[in-house]
Amino acid sequence: MDRLGSARARLVMCTALVLIAAACGSDDKASTATTATTTAAADTTATPATTATAATTAAPAANGTGTTSPDSGLQHETFTTADGTVIDYVMVVPPDREVGKEGKVVFAFPPGGQDLDTTENVVNGRWRDEALKRGWVVVSPAAPESGLYYSDKSAKYVPELLDAIAKQYPPEGGKFDLGGVSNGGLSAFKAALDYPERFRSLVVFPGYSQDGGDDPNLSKLKDIGVAMFVGGEDTGWRQASELTEKTLKDLGYKVELHVVEGSGHIIESLTGADLFDAMERVRA
């Protein structure tokens, strides 16, 4: 990468971290989980971000309208559900990805209020470059007017959107991978627990079940590999994550927990490479 490209990558990452921090600051799901009985090993290393060539062509959305930004590699799409609810979402599609051909697709929930600007900024800062490098499609939905995706009123639309995406870019083996940060991590756990047959992995940074780390419904994740990242200073979320890890390990399921010591709710050292590496390790 030349010096200009390196500077651009650093600027994108720094800008994204500021915007993620602002978004996560509005999260209203503080943890009250029971203190865990185990502590995971710290993971304080991170791979430098990689800048990849942006996608310049893409198929049109399954319904509605879409726009593509060649400079950023991002597509803005609109999906209308059966009941008329409009969902805006952001996509990253590698330039060599063929429409109708199976491949890896990650469905990633944004943090905070899950508005479109936040959604775009997180995709741009955490998912885009590594997805283009590795050939992954990324789909990240902004919340509809019905509310955030950890609520039943909005979570019910997830299967419809997955079906629409699958018509264009079928996920490998018929199952999507799943990601989320903060409120998006809560949303990702809800989607995995509500529709476990649709997913093969779950990566959150951070996230857990709203019913706690000892939620009996975690048994539904038998066929979903789970990787969690949490800041060592993010006390409530760390406790919930540690208890989630213990519950899943006791069930004999595939799970990783990376506690990044010295970090708070926003894990600044975490890169797209870290996220995709974890996803590829745990995916079923």
Predicted regions and their residues:
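A domain-start/cap signature at the N-terminus of enzymes
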Residues: 25-26, 32-37, 42, 48-105, ...
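C-terminal motif of bacterial Sec signal peptides marking the signal peptidase cleavage site
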Residues: 20-23
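Short substrate-entry loop that stabilizes the transition state in hydrolases
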Residues: 97-103, 108-148, 236
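Bacterial N-terminal signal peptides that target proteins for export
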Residues: 1-12
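Structural recognition of the beta-strand scaffold that forms the well-ordered cores
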Residues: 90, 105-109, 137-142, 175-180, ...
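Short glycine-enriched nucleophile-adjacent loop
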Residues: 185-196
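Gly/Ser-rich "nucleophile elbow"/oxyanion-hole loop immediately N-terminal to the catalytic nucleophile
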Residues: 96-102, 149-183
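The feature captures the conserved acid-bearing segment of alpha/beta-hydrolase catalytic domains
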Residues: 201, 206-280
